[in-house]
Swiss-Prot record:
GTP binds at residues 24-31, 71-75, 133-136. It comes from Deinococcus geothermalis (strain DSM 11300 / CIP 105573 / AG-3a). The gene is era. One of its GO terms (molecular function) is ribosomal small subunit binding. PROSITE patterns: G_ERA, KH_TYPE_2. This is GTPase Era.
Length: 309
């Protein structure tokens, strides 16, 4: 993974670079924090838990420092093969990183899922940052932070604490980012300085579409939807033509995603297209199709085909 060509020439200032996992239970603000670190959108966000399904790498670089943030799925008790894959993504990230950000929600005391995260990170000999999020909406943030801190009792590794508001003020995010930069080991850069993510454009666009679907679909249906881009072409006039699929498990789900007269699918497509146009800074044609792959969340072959491997 290391590219020696990204190292400074002999005699130049040495570079520091490392991988930093962002972990926590579902829906505590991990992806929102990652996007704030980078000042751009590389990870999907929605009010629903488990929006993030795979480890998304976001890259922040200065002239001599590089953080590769790994935004992980929320650690939880899995109900299917997809859930097991998501937990494996977390465990794999923790094994390979140089530092850990554990994000907790200060509006609530620790839950069983928080305890599960604490057990994963407590004994790891890596710098750990306990991030108390949503402090502005918490009634008793100091007491909540004390309870989360207690879950790390007995930890001997380097530990830092910081509270953040739900709005992630630029000053607070920058201060935390500087603290993380100080913890990086001396290494050559892992990615070119201009990189913001290791995702392909197709993966990124598919996640934008899935985010908009999750915002609009109800009950358990959002968790039974996957997305993939099947074709992306650019016309001579600059228009980006993107074809994508929304994958569901049942014909009944297909009807719900399409909606009466196609209303739901149009809403998802219009919202996703607007996001894509803002970030791509060009006109986009987005064509969506809903297909059925029965039981895809329990089908390991289907999961691999959808990129969960």
């Amino acid at each position: 993974m290391t590219d020696q060509s990204l190292s400074p020439e002999s005699g130049e200032t040495p570079t520091h670079a490392g991988f930093v996992a962002i972990v926590g239970k579902p829906n505590v603000g991990k992806s929102t924090l990652l996007n704030a670190f980078l000042n751009t959108k590389v990870a999907p966000t929605s009010p629903r838990p488990q929006t993030t399904r795979r480890g998304v790498r976001g890259i922040y670089s200065t002239d001599t420092q590089q953080i590769v943030f790994v935004d992980t799925p929320g650690l939880h008790k899995p109900k299917d093969a997809l859930g097991k894959y998501m937990n494996q993504e977390v465990q794999s990230a923790l094994a390979d990183v140089d530092a850990i950000l554990w994000v907790v929600d200060l509006r609530h005391p620790p839950t069983e899922e928080d305890e599960l995260v604490a057990r994963q990170v407590r004994d790891l000999p890596k710098p750990l940052f306990l991030i108390g999020n949503k402090v502005d909406a918490a009634k008793y943030p100091d007491e909540a932070m004390r309870l989360y801190r207690a879950l790390l009792e007995g930890r001997t590794g380097e530990t830092h604490e910081r509270m953040l508001s739900a709005q992630n003020s630029p000053q607070a995010v920058a201060a935390l980012r500087e603290q993380i930069l100080d913890a990086l080991p001396e290494n050559p850069f892992f990615f070119p300085r201009s990189s913001a993510s290791d995702q392909t454009r197709e993966q990124w666009a598919a996640e934008i579409i899935r985010e908009e679907a999750m915002k609009r679909l109800r009950e358990e249906l959002p968790y039974a939807v996957a997305t993939r881009v099947t074709n992306w072409t650019e016309r001579e006039d600059g228009l980006q033509r993107i074809e994508a699929e929304l994958i569901v498990e049942k014909n009944a789900h297909k009807g719900m995603v399409i909606g009466a007269g196609g209303k739901m699918l149009r809403e998802i497509g219009q919202a996703a297209r607007k996001q894509l146009e803002v970030f791509l800074n060009c006109k986009v044609f987005l064509g969506l199709e809903v297909i059925v792959i029965p039981g895809w969340r329990e089908d390991e072959e289907a999961l691999r085909e959808l990129g969960y491997e």
